[in-house]
């Protein structure tokens, strides 16, 4: 239906240009002298295809672009959730695409290509395909950013500079907020110790990553685990901070003990 989406399993007809018409247009563009085709799927009437969110499959343009390559002789570029290095390499090697294009993954981690080249894949900060900082802000006419990398597109303004006076800082809470605070502080040269009441990092992000289409949420948790190891940040698991005396060694304390659920009263409407 025009301008509408559907939930999984719902039957509906998407409006817009169909694939066969797209192939005809692609050939016309090649004949007109185009050097390459950066081909994606969808149009303004089904815009979520252009910027596939988390519930779309990774590499969801590949079946279409593989058929496109059979119709044209110029290079074909493929984007659309192609940030998995193994998927990208396999797609090129198997002839599904000539080049892989990245946009949102570069906002999540601008060094993704360098890390792939140097075989440091575990250090790649994952894109969640959540649309919060990029497409979501763009639709509000705000400067784009990234939910997992607030410095995206503002690298000069938010550059991490060495602290003039390194301090000893305790971070209470090993969720995403606490881990990010610990990481940034350590990158700037502070001495950081992280305390987590449970036996693992990630907090409520682990619950958020329970659906199979949100596995990138768990990948972000894993990324923070790698960062804690890389930066040699001491993490005290199964430790509850109850008294200020426990942290008397610290110059400052950051409380990141977790978020609360938003609730609202529906009254008698159900």
Give the location of each predicted region.
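Flavin-dependent oxidoreductase catalytic cores
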Residues: 1-172, 176-192, 200, 260-265, ...
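Glycine-/small-residue-rich beta->alpha transition segments that form the dinucleotide
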Residues: 250-252, 256-263
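Alpha-helix C-terminal capping/helix-to-coil transition sites in glycosyltransferase folds
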Residues: 96, 248-249
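Structural alpha-helical scaffold elements that stabilize or flank donor/cofactor-binding regions
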Residues: 93, 227, 245-246
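A conserved short coil-to-beta-strand element within the FAD-binding core of flavoproteins
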Residues: 236-248
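Beta1-alpha1 glycine-rich phosphate/pyrophosphate-binding loop at the start
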Residues: 171-238, 262-264
